[in-house]
Amino acid sequence: MIFPAIDLQDGRSVRLYKGDFAQETVINPDPVDQAKQYETAKVGALHLVDLDGAKAGKPINVDIVKAVRAAFTGILEIGGGIRDKAAVDLYLGMGVDRVILGSVALKNPELTKQVIAEYGAERIVIGVDGKNGKVAAEGWLDQSDVPMTDLIGAMIEGGAKYFIVTDVERDGTMQGANEDLLGNLQKEFPTARIVASGGVRNLDDIKSLEAKGVMDSIVGKALYEGTITLEEIAEYNQQN
């Protein structure tokens, strides 16, 4: 499945370059309107990131997420600033399908396992962000020495299934996904569902990832640059 992304900052839809909060491009001043366009196109899935929340460590753009949920009927997932159970309960309680736990999975694995046990692996997604195979946290501002493989292995033991793996060095660059990293992780953890994020350009990239067993991808800049279209995403998702 392909998830088009909407990144929220200051109430607008933006794109960052390599996760740098200072290097933003405003995509749409009205993210809800953008979500309605995705709904009309029948893309079937949407990946939301609360960038303000990622920085603040708590949900910030809650009203926008609620309005997006009302406008969009497909699978909706949200990440950014979800660091405690109250935030998980908040989003799942308003009808969001999946929440993405990134920093908290690294820093509070017991809480992460607790919410997986309560809500199930279909609703709790682990965000594994980083570079050089090591995990980054706190909106990518904090680079750790923890290997991605350690975090994924521990979370699988805790019941997790979905892992959105973002290579920070590729995000927003249009250089192609880090296929070696993603393919190797999928091979090492065959029960996991590795989701590609960062650098995905077009359907060729997505099919190349598929060949390595990586069946889900998130696209952001590629959609705005026109190298992949809403129509292509909708058609792909309806067939898969």
PLM region spans:
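Active-site-adjacent beta->alpha loops and helix N-cap segments on the catalytic face
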Residues: 2, 53-69, 83-89, 103-125, ...
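Conserved, mostly hydrophobic/aromatic
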Residues: 7, 38, 46, 91, ...
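Conserved anion-binding
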Residues: 11-14, 18-22, 92, 96-171
